[in-house]
């Protein structure tokens, strides 16, 4: 498995995978197509603080993820926020997510925390994440959208 920084050549495949991801049970709400396209644009341009990664197997993109980093005062250092993680159905069960997390741990070896969101119903993903050492965050989050 090879992990690459998302670029313009990946756009069409990431859009295809994004449509599958954003319609899956990994989310608890719909995401409009214009937002999906904006996310891809931001990741490819690299100027919005969003980094896109694609997962390639035999020169085929089989998954994608977005990452952003920020300073987390609770740990006194950088937090890597994994935003979206999708592997197509044909590539699941082959350790892609585990390999990706290990790739991120190496790439961001100076980070003090790695964090992401997962819906409570995604039992298989939660089981994997716990096996890797991730723990639940005991407090909720709040938001206000200004889209």
Locate predicted features.
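Conserved GNAT-fold acetyl-CoA-binding loop/helix
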Residues: 22-41
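A short helix-loop-beta-strand connector motif used in the catalytic cores of GNAT acetyltransferases and
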Residues: 42-54, 81
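Conserved acetyl-CoA binding element of GNAT-fold acetyltransferases
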Residues: 77-89
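Conserved acetyl-CoA-binding loop-helix of GNAT-fold acetyltransferases
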Residues: 87, 93-106, 127, 131
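Conserved beta-strand-loop-alpha-helix junction that forms the acyl-donor binding cleft
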Residues: 92, 115-126, 143-147
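Conserved GNAT acetyl-CoA-binding A-motif
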Residues: 101, 108-118
């Amino acid at each position: 498995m090879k992990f690459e920084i998302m670029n313009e050549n990946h756009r069409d495949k990431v859009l295809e995978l994004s449509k599958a991801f954003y319609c899956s049970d990994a989310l608890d709400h719909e995401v409009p197509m214009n937002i999906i396209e904006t996310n891809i644009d931001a990741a490819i341009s690299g100027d919005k603080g969003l980094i896109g990664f694609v997962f390639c197997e035999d020169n085929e993109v089989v998954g994608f993820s977005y990452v952003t980093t920020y300073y987390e005062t609770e740990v006194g250092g950088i937090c890597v926020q994994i935003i979206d993680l999708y592997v197509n159905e044909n590539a699941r069960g082959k350790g892609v997510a585990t390999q990706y997390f290990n790739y991120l741990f190496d790439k961001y070896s100076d980070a003090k925390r790695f964090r992401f969101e997962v819906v409570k119903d995604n039992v298989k993903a939660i089981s994997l994440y716990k096996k890797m050492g991730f723990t639940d965050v005991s407090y909720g989050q709040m938001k206000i959208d200004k889209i």
